[in-house]
Design a protein with these regions (language model features):
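Well-ordered alpha-helical scaffold segments within catalytic/enzyme domains
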Residues: 329-345, 391-397
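Short, charged beta-turn/beta-strand-edge "cap" motif at the junction between a beta-strand
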Residues: 246-250
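Hydrophobic h-region of N-terminal signal peptides that target proteins for export
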Residues: 8-17
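Bacterial N-terminal signal peptides that target proteins for export
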Residues: 1-6
């Protein structure tokens, strides 16, 4: 898809002359707004785009029937990117959720998808309990799940990609009393949603405000939960402005697409160093106490206790795990390195005890690491994994 073929008819006025911006066709865009009265099911209204007579870059988003809101949308060319500004004004107190979809024109099956820090290709390397194509080929997520509030769709057939990115200062957030279904927010949030959907075989960018998650929400690691849709109050006479930026380009492959998206995200969001009250040296000193408090030295293989740890008590457990969650050998290497740097003989001594105990007692009869040992329950897990074995070898070498 080429946005220059997608968006037709908009002229951006600069000085006396008008310069043609990214072309726009309402047929490729669909928008809707859902309104909710607390205690009742929401009502969804489709929005038709009607171009304003005196401004060819602005549209009135007309609902399918009368609602107590006025919604307008303005498009502006920003150095070859299309910036969309949506303005919502309440004629009376309303709880709302606004959404918009952009059809890329790409065949959904030809596409790979990217959401920074959360979604790569089709996420098929993730467990089925995490968001992936194992569950659905369409996903909407909260923007704060991502390293940047952006979704990208890359067509391997067309060698082209399209992204949508939210532009905001993200100053507000509010807790909700429920985690699923239609929920009423108790205050203002800056968090919207972004994602992709398969609409009749066509890959579609979806975005809106406030947040939605569908077809599942992801409440914690490896835990999918029912979908959620948030509604924020807009009081009579109040207005809210929402801004997204569309960007498209031709590119050779998906890896180059990811690189381009990261560079674009950094340039757009300009992340700054966060000033903290504690120095890195102080935090390392505090965190190194884990190597002291968690050390277990009365078992055939010594280890740092962390697996199945109860955070309320931080009591030591009986599970010695080489890699992954337990990270016993890598933690021993970290403790050894830090201990030598800081001349902490206690850390160095315990680290060597762990290495020596594993070299003596940590291998199975077939020569692999005993990856997970449950000492009080008196059994060793027999299934081996590349990750734990490789982490153990890496730490020892």
């Amino acid at each position: 898809m080429n946005l220059k073929c997608l968006f037709c008819g908009i002229l951006v006025g600069l000085y006396v002359e008008a310069i043609e911006a990214v072309n726009y066709t309402p047929e490729k865009i669909s928008a809707s707004i859902s309104l909710k009265v607390p205690g009742n099911e929401s009502e969804k209204y489709s929005l038709d785009m009607r171009q304003l007579k005196n401004d060819r870059s602005s549209y009135l988003l007309e609902p399918s029937k009368g609602i107590p809101m006025v919604i307008t949308q303005r498009m502006e060319d920003m150095n070859g990117k299309l910036r969309i500004n949506v303005s919502l004004t309440a004629l009376e107190d309303v709880y709302f959720n606004f959404s918009e979809q952009l059809s890329t024109g790409f065949n959904h099956d030809d596409c790979q998808f990217y959401m920074p820090g959360f979604w790569y290709r089709r996420n098929l390397r993730s467990p089925k309990e995490a968001p992936s194509f194992h569950t659905s080929d369409s996903w909407l997520v909260r923007e704060d799940r991502l390293s940047a509030p952006l979704t990208g769709i890359y067509s391997e057939k067309e060698k082209s990609f399209v992204t949508v990115s939210r532009i905001d200062n993200f100053a507000n957030e509010v807790l909700s009393t429920h985690r699923e279904g239609e929920i009423i927010l108790s205050g203002k949030t800056s968090i919207g949603f972004t994602g992709f959907e398969n609409q009749n075989g066509v890959a579609t960018l979806s975005f809106g405000f406030p947040y939605r998650e569908a077809p599942k929400s992801y409440i914690r690691k490896l835990t999918l939960a029912p979908s959620v849709e948030a509604y924020q109050l807009l009081r009579k006479g109040e207005s809210l402005s929402l801004t997204w930026e569309l960007h498209e380009s031709e590119i050779a492959d998906f890896s180059e697409c990811v690189q381009h998206i990261w560079e674009y995200s950094y340039d757009t969001n300009c992340p700054q160093i966060v000033n903290t009250p504690y120095s890195p040296e102080k935090m390392k000193e505090v965190m190194s106490n884990f190597f002291v408090e968690s050390f277990v030295g009365n078992t055939p293989t010594h280890y740092y206790s962390g697996v199945e740890l109860r955070t309320a008590t931080c009591d030591q457990t009986d599970v010695a795990e080489v890699g992954f969650v337990g990270r016993t050998l890598l933690n021993a290497f970290n403790a050894l390195e830090y201990g030598e740097q800081q001349r902490r003989t206690d850390l160095v001594t315990n680290a060597y005890k762990i290495f020596d105990s594993y070299l003596q007692n940590g291998f199975s009869e077939t020569g692999f690491f005993n990856e997970v040992v449950h000492y009080r329950r008196n059994f060793v897990e027999s299934v081996h994994s590349i990750r734990r074995q490789s982490e153990g070898v890496y730490a020892l070498l």
